[in-house]
Amino acid sequence: MPTRTISISEEAYEKLKSLKSSEKDSFSDVILRYYPKKRKLSEVLAEIGPNPELADAIEKVSGEMRAEKMREIDPES
């Protein structure tokens, strides 16, 4: 498997190091364990915590999507 070299802060390094479950655990293992390819939206939102700005934006887009769906159902509106 190819490898990449990245630069991270000392703080990020220490955080990753503390998340290793054993000496055999690689930093790649840690990253993939905590950030799998697919995550549930609820997990992401729980991780970032309350965000009123994001909630307002989601509500606005959701309303726009519902309105568009209604126009598709009733094209005369």
Curated annotation (Swiss-Prot):
Disulfide-linked positions: none
Keyword Zinc-finger annotated: no
Q: Which domain of life is it from?
A: Archaea
Q: Mind listing the UniProt keywords for this protein, alphabetically?
A: Toxin-antitoxin system
Q: Name one Pfam family in it.
A: VAPB_antitox
InterPro entries annotated for this entry? Put_antitoxin (IPR003847)
Provide the function of this protein: Possibly the antitoxin component of a type II toxin-antitoxin (TA) system. Its cognate toxin is VapC3 (Potential).
Output the NCBIfam families linked to this UniProt entry.
Answer: PRK13696.1-1
Q: Which family does it belong to?
A: Belongs to the UPF0330 family.
Q: What is this protein called?
A: Putative antitoxin VapB3
- The protein's organism comes out as Methanosarcina acetivorans (strain ATCC 35395 / DSM 2834 / JCM 12185 / C2A)
The major lineage groups are: Archaea, Methanobacteriati, Methanobacteriota, Stenosarchaea group, Methanomicrobia
